[in-house]
Amino acid sequence: HAESLGYDALVSGELNNEPFLPVLLGLEHSKKMIVRTGLAIAFPRSPMTVANMGWDLQSFSDGRFQLGLGTQVKGHNERRFSVPWSPPAPRMREYILAVKAIWNTWKTGEKLDFQGEHYTHTLMTPMFTPPPMDCDVPPIYVSGLGPGMAKIAGEVADGLLLHPMCSPK
């Protein structure tokens, strides 16, 4: 219905709901609309899990899915999600590189060998490799509030999602 009203994009955030189910519904009920998580909180989810979801949604939609990732604040990571806290910008860089390494393995068949400070992915067998896609992997957008995340977005992502409360000051 949104597409018939002239909308060309849909964004699903993660507040009081999980963001991927609304994305699936948006992709299922549209033909051309771009649909993005805006944003999915990264650190409580394994890069492998997010890579799988991104691959499946991109394949299902013939290339209309965009992956928006964010870090959330320390209190939510530690007390809501029970995830250890570390400086978010370097960890997000590693997270995105891990997702991209997984996608590269699925696209090329190269051995998975990602080893970082926070994430290690070294096992991928044919049984767990998704079918090939006819489109490219989803673009990845990073949410950010300050220069550290903006730098990460420029270095390893496809774009930056600004916080709704951002201002020039």
Predicted regions and their residues:
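N-terminal beta1-alpha1-beta2 module of alpha/beta enzyme domains
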Residues: H1-T37, P138
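A cross-domain feature marking catalytic cores of carbohydrate-active enzymes
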Residues: G13-L15, T37-I41, L69-T71, G144, ...
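Alpha-helix capping and helix-loop boundary segments enriched in small/acidic/polar residues
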Residues: E14-N17, P44-R45, S86
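Generic structural signal for helix capping and beta-alpha/helix-loop junctions
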Residues: P19, R45, G75-N77
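Short hydrophobic alpha-helical runs that function as membrane-insertion/retention elements
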Residues: I34-R36, G159-L162
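Structural motif corresponding to the early beta-alpha repeats
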Residues: V35-T49, M53
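Internal, glycine-rich beta/alpha segment that forms the wall or movable "lid"
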Residues: A51-G159, C166-K169
